[in-house]
Structure formats: C-alpha cells, structure tokens
Amino acid sequence: MEADKKTTAQTESNRDLSEQIKKVTKDVHVRAESTELMLSFQRGQVTLQQYKLLLCSLYEIYLALEEEMDRNCDHPSVAPIYFPAELARLATIEKDLEFFFGPDWREKIVVPAATERYCHRIRQIGQENPEYLIAHAYTRYLGDLSGGQVLGRIAQKSMKLGGSEGLSFFAFPGVSSPNLFKRLYRSRMNSVELTEEQRSAVLQEALGAFEFNIQVFEDLQKMLNVTENEPGVGTPRSRPATTLQVGGSMIQTNPLFRMVLGLCLALATVSIGLYAL
C-alpha cells in the first residue's frame, strides 16, 4: 500500500509542469550559468559596465514580458500565475537605470540584437499563444527570485556601491518568504489545464527562453569586449537604432555608439585580426 502511494505521488510529481520544465531545461540552465557574463557574477567580478548593459537588456525584456502578461491577465493559462504586486520588475529596473544613467536614461539604452529577438518572441506569443508565456514568466521570475538576494550582494560588493541604490531589481518587497512564494507559484502553474500538445509546446518554449538568455549574455559580452573603457556605451541616441555585426553577432546600437565601436574595431583588426563585416 505504501509503495502504491509513493508510486502515485511520484507519477503526479512527474506530471507537474514545473518539474517537467526543470527536467528538460537542466542542461541548458547549466550552459546559461557558464556564460562569461554569468561567471563574472559568480566570481564576484561583475563590473559597472557589465551591470549597466545587462540592466538595459533586462528593461527591454521585462517591458515586453510584463506588457504581454498584463494584456493577457484574464487568459486561463496566464491568470493563475499573474502576480504583478509581488513579481513585477519593470519599475525597479527603471529606478536602477535612472540611478546609473540619470533622468534621461531612456535615451541612453543600448541593447544587442539578441535582446530584440527575445522581446520579439515574447510579444509574438502574447499575441498568438498566450499559454507559452508560462515558460517565460517561470524562467524569468522564479530565476530572479531564487538568486536575487545573493546576486544583489555580489553586485553591490563588486561595484563598491555604498547602499542599495542601483540594486532595486534584486529586491522583492512584496514577497516575504521567497521559498513559500515559489511553492505557491509552482502550485498555481501546475494547476493550469493544458492539452498534451500545449504542454509539449510550453516545454519547448522554456528551452527557447534559456537559449535566448544565453544569446543575450554572449552578445553583451562581445559588446563589452570591444567597447571596454570606451565612453560610447550608453550615449544618447538621436536617431532610430541601427544594427552592427561584431564577430558574427548583430548588435542593436545608435549612430554615435556605432562610430566609437567602428573605431575600436579598426584598432582591433590590426592587433588581433578581428574583422567587422
């Protein structure tokens, strides 16, 4: 009898969407944590330039995600996991961007093309398949909630920040107990009714979410490698953003930044053979 109960419980656990996502994304999760940008965080070596560029991309990603979550908040697949008061990140990122870039921070945002692709996908599924938002909300929000406090302390120490200003993104004042809240969130997510086809698609979307994050991290690192210590990063853009290819990666940028980037690339071509196409 006890064995039957354990088998039944195990079967139910294996059917939980949260457990299935965790299982199918295990390998790609490790890859995401092994990117150069994330390793800098883990080693306590994150720089101000790294963090500022990361914040710019996080702003665009959460802008897309939270607009689509808000728009689909009554959808049967989204409503159970819609927790704007507890999880919304956009306002916290805006606060951090203003701290680092000043009141005109919106004119100084620079993001790689990988970020644009990520955002495009979120908006696309928000329009066509809102149930896929489950995958992006789960991987983003619970990932940030799980590592937020630790990464916040690492960032504060690495960048030698005196207080919590600039680190609002890592704080979840609406969540008194992260562990209890994550349990509630998973329970709500597991309660969403999906067909087998939809469930399979959500699992694939979760894999895609991690792949998008890896691409963003890699593109950001390429930008940092080329523009380290250059004043062009974060300069105002007076015209619509354009794209530039660096080492096979398309980077979303502005005319002034592109000029600085091009000069840096020319020097790099002479010294290490890096060619801008």
From Swiss-Prot:
Q: What gene name does this entry carry?
A: hmox
Under the heading PROSITE patterns, the entry gives: HEME_OXYGENASE
Q: Which GO terms describe its molecular function?
A: heme binding; heme oxygenase (decyclizing) activity; metal ion binding
Listed GO cellular component terms? endoplasmic reticulum
What SUPFAM superfamilies is this protein classified in?
Heme oxygenase-like
Task: State where heme b binds.
Answer: H29
Where is this chain's protein located in or outside the cell? Microsome; Endoplasmic reticulum
Give the organism, scientific name: Takifugu rubripes (Japanese pufferfish)
**Top-level taxon of the source organism:** Eukaryota
Name listed for the protein in its UniProt record: Heme oxygenase
Q: Which reaction does it catalyse?
A: heme b + 3 reduced [NADPH--hemoprotein reductase] + 3 O2 = biliverdin IXalpha + CO + Fe(2+) + 3 oxidized [NADPH--hemoprotein reductase] + 3 H2O + H(+)
Q: Which BP terms from GO are recorded? A: heme catabolic process; heme oxidation; response to oxidative stress
The record's PANTHER family line, in alphabetical order, gives: HEME OXYGENASE, HEME OXYGENASE 1
